Amino acid sequence: MIVRQVASLAEFTPDKMGKTTIAMAESLFVGLNAFEPGQEHVAHAHAGQDKLYLVLEGSAEVRVGEEETVLSAGDAAVARSGVVHAIRNPGPNRMIVLAVLAPPPKK
């Protein structure tokens, strides 16, 4: 599968983070998270799954464990299995993040 212009697939919603599935495989999930200004994905953890956030557009306040930082387009953060993480759009513009989970979520 080849997907070009991934960010163009983002789906924004006014009430909460938008989610779009890009690919689901036996060992990997790839999705887009779309955030309007101020929207967030609250602190949570994934047992048995590692997660990578790659900022495609905008800027992101990210917390992984005890570490907090602001990421820009092209920056990434990794949350290992069981580590609490959160992400928020602090900026005035929309934010799009590629989210990769391995292994994928169970249906």
Report residues per predicted region.
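A short, N-terminal "cap"/entry segment at the start of jelly-roll beta-barrel domains
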Residues: 1-31, 42, 73, 77-78
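Short, charged/polar surface micro-motifs in flexible loops or helix N-caps
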Residues: 26-28, 36-40, 59, 103-107
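A generic "binding-loop/recognition-motif" signal
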Residues: 28, 48, 67, 83, ...
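Conserved hydrophobic/aromatic positions in well-ordered beta-strands
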Residues: 31-33, 53
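Histidine-centered metal-chelating micro-motifs
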Residues: 40-42, 61, 77, 81-87
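A short beta-strand-loop-beta hairpin characteristic of the jelly-roll/cupin
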Residues: 46-73
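Ligand-binding loop in jelly-roll beta-barrel domains
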Residues: 81-106
